């Protein structure tokens, strides 16, 4: 690898680091004779783990950080005086293959600034994926960031070679997008999303009729929203996410806490730290929407338009509805057990299965994996000595569960807990 390409790599990897929608999840490509690489499905993270324990990494890079747009919130905006670089299609393909051969990566996450026009940029992204698949027989994971405003033909071609395509909404409300990025609009984002959805549904029907039809975007599509750069409430953001999840091909909405990279622009809020706690709460609420059968209006409403930063959304909901608790863990249905703070999907299923043979008590629940520190106030079962939420009052339970602030709070330190026990 020559020094010129290494210098470009350093610049373009730095420019790509603010994109959080990087995931090697949702698709499996097994190594086949005559192909290079393989990937194992993971869950929504840049680094995933294969079945044999290997750590899976993606090369996360931009094709170029030159851009014709001057978005206020973007480090790569046209007016910024920053180091710029562009990789040719062949340079990026060779870089990906070389990194794979060295066992640095298992896949590619590729985005780009927009140069000339959306179609010109999209065509170059497609060429990278096409050359990797057809010329080098690369069988690893490829995630392409589709360019807003790109043509249907290019989006459809990209879908033949990429495992996942994503088009970023960036700012949830169009009027706020126009304030910070006057050259952009939501129409140019939603149109490629529709192309991807139509392509997936058409491909699904074709595969029923013809045996060897290639798969189209097997890992579906995703999008990303910036949180904290504008005035949207969490309610606005979650309603938009919920509507996006109604589309069968939308696999993931990512939330990126606004990082103040262009402090000179007075249209932007002067934040000392990115709103990481808020970002974390949005991910937890998103989890409730997708896996816990919650509706948006149960998590946020006109009275509570923003998520509580001190407690997680499920606990917040339970404390607002003490009349529904405590539930008898040995009698309640699965849907209600799933809503108990401290009980995740896996634990709820184990509870349903285990109670058929014997009544469950404190120690059985703890052994299953229930976080009794939270759950004990919302359930009744054999041998449970703790008083419930109605006896202690929601305020009392909240006081017991909210962590006591330390002398010096470091807002940067967070535990993004998306384990089973939510």
Label each residue range with its predicted role:
Residues 68, 72-75:
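Cys/His/Pro-rich metal-binding microdomains
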Residues 306-336, 362-422:
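C-terminal extensions
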Residues 173, 188-265, 274-300:
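Conserved C-terminal portion of the radical SAM core fold
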Residues 1-66, 371, 379-380, 387-408, ...:
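Flexible, acidic/Gly-rich N-terminal and inter-domain linker regions that tether
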Residues 122-130, 134, 159-168, 228-247, ...:
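Short, electropositive alpha-helical surface patch
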Residues 271-274, 288-326:
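Alpha-helical ds-nucleic-acid-binding substructure associated with the helix-hairpin-helix region
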